[in-house]
Amino acid sequence: MHITQLVLRHFRCFDVVDFFPLPGLNFFIGENGSGKTSLLEAVHLMGYGRSFRGRVRDGLIRHGSENLEIFVDWQETALINARRRRAGLSHYGQEWIGRLDGQKIMHLASLCAALAVITFESSSYQLINSNAELRRRFLDWGLFHVEPDFLDLWRRYTHVLKQRNSLLKQKEELAMLEAWDQKLSEVGEQLTFRRFQYLERLKQRVIPLISRITPNLKIHGFNFNHGWRRHELPLIDALFISRERDYQYGYTSLGPHRSDWTPQFSSIPGVHFLSRGQGKLITLMCLLAQAQDFFDQRGEWPILALDDLASELDQKHQWRVLEMLAEIPAQVLITGTEIPQGLKPFFSVGAMFHVEHGAITRMF
């Protein structure tokens, strides 16, 4: 899929912008504060239903305005049932209002399912060395887009988990807790299996990508922590064993909501030994592997939004990343404060835009 038109009204530093990106590589150059990141933020907002830079009160609406609007048209590129799509997202007062193909949507998940965006921004490197919740979200995003029933499965697990935690806080009777343990284990085992299988698919894509981009790291796979000792006992038994502790804590201490995964290297002891630049490359390759899996399952590429791609990467690694991006038929939106040397060989296969004072001008 690729965006054919993006309209912003009263979004961040933009008053009104009507922009037409190209299907392939799109480079956006401008000074800090010019609106480059805000442009990708708007695309991200349409694909995730939230910003990666804060909430509405953090300056999402242009100063002096009372509302914001984002409209996006895109072309699906799957071989079967490809069509043109249109979506809009507005914020008035305290409410977000979304529309998809001319119809008002009740939940932003409908919009997120339609427009797939993979975003790399300043905090994305935390994927591999920060808290486990980010890594669970990473897996769940991919499953949400390639397995139609995954959202329902995830919601069922979340609902049952909340019910069990409520019973633990209220010190409810054992019989009632046992019933919810059974439900939690049934859904939890399914959720864990989906995540594990998806991570195994990603491993087959990540290893060759990292070997090509930074071969010295020698990645050999991922370690998946199920959230309990699954190799020793099923979830239903683990919940029974932890029941007394859970009563004491007032919440469920194990299960898929405690799962995690980490890349494994033969060249270094762990991710904490990576430089910031290496961490950025590993994260970026994980995201590209996710994009490849999306293509393999759906028959089209998601939109890639890469903010400040060249920072902390030397010219050699810039070139390798851009060479890889130029080989895939995905729409890629890349920002930077200047034109890095590593990008110049790829201008012939993309377009360059200058962002200044809330305006976007094509350079070539």
From Swiss-Prot:
Family: Belongs to the RecF family.
Pfam family for this entry, one: SMC_N
GO CC annotations on file: cytoplasm
Main function: The RecF protein is involved in DNA metabolism; it is required for DNA replication and normal SOS inducibility. RecF binds preferentially to single-stranded, linear DNA. It also seems to bind ATP.
Gene Ontology BP, a term: SOS response
Name of the featured protein: DNA replication and repair protein RecF
Cleaved signal peptide residues: none
Domain of life: Bacteria
Any one GO molecular-function label of the UniProt entry: single-stranded DNA binding
The keyword NAD appears for this protein: no
Keywords in alphabetical order: ATP-binding, Cytoplasm, DNA damage, DNA repair, DNA replication, DNA-binding, Nucleotide-binding, SOS response
Annotated localization: Cytoplasm
Principal subcellular localisation of the protein: cytoplasm
UniProt: ATP binding residues: 30-37
Cited Gene3D superfamilies: P-loop containing nucleotide triphosphate hydrolases, RecF/RecN/SMC, N-terminal domain
